[in-house]
Amino acid sequence: MDEWIDYYDSTHTIYASKRHRDLHFQIIAKDIIGYIAAPDAVVLDYACGEALAAAKVADACSMLILAEPAPGVRGRLIARFAPNTKIRVRSLEELKNMAEKSIDLVVMNSVAQYMTPAELDSAFAVVRRLIKPAGRLVVGDILRPKVGMAIDVLALLRFAAKSGFMKDALYGLLSTALSEYRQLRTRLGLQRYSEKDMIAKLARAGFSASRARRNIGHNPWRMTFVARHAGAGEPGAAD
């Protein structure tokens, strides 16, 4: 995961335009809010990235913890949200020192594809310790086997056409094709899981999970899973 962390900590071209970037984070925030069960919930966004719309999520809960591995991004988060008393910024390492059973909802969105299977197992172990007995883990934007970059391109173009940044999207795709992102994706690859494999992986980590009806974010060809502590009842899902 380290090379991907370095990439996202750099001046990258993953977003086609400011409008694309802003809408991306707004949609994710809206989807996360859909999983918040009560206004007194404590929410953890694991490897949150720039989290530009995090204030909206914080408005829907009692506390939002933004955990981010990239030091540059983490510094910007601290500066951006310093006035917001409901938002805390932490490194992933700091999560290991947090109180057990202190979190109602953990969201890991668009993270698993950048981790090795062993790294993801370790992350599941860390967050499982933090989740309250009735809490939930939401693992979003999981890439499926045999669904390649062409589908990601189609999802982006559909999103752009609907949201009014098609010209920027086309230019952005050209830039991405020549960028370090494409080189990293070709060299390192992205981890992919079938529905069955992700549910089994979560089960081995001590969770009972099911696939949500819709994915977090704009890409309907990817998957989101909702998990609870094994034996805590059926996992719920947002619409």
Language model regions located:
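Conserved acidic residues
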Residues: 41, 62, 104
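Class I (Rossmann-like) S-adenosyl-L-methionine-dependent methyltransferase catalytic domain
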Residues: 1-37, 50-85, 89-96, 138-239
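Conserved class I S-adenosyl-L-methionine
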Residues: 40-49
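Short catalytic micro-motifs in class I SAM-dependent methyltransferases
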Residues: 110-111
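A short glycine-rich, Lys/Arg-flanked "PGG" loop and its adjoining helix->strand segment in the class I
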Residues: 121-133
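A conserved beta-strand element that flanks and buttresses the S-adenosyl-L-methionine
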Residues: 107
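Helix-capping/helix-break motifs at membrane-protein junctions
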Residues: 116-117
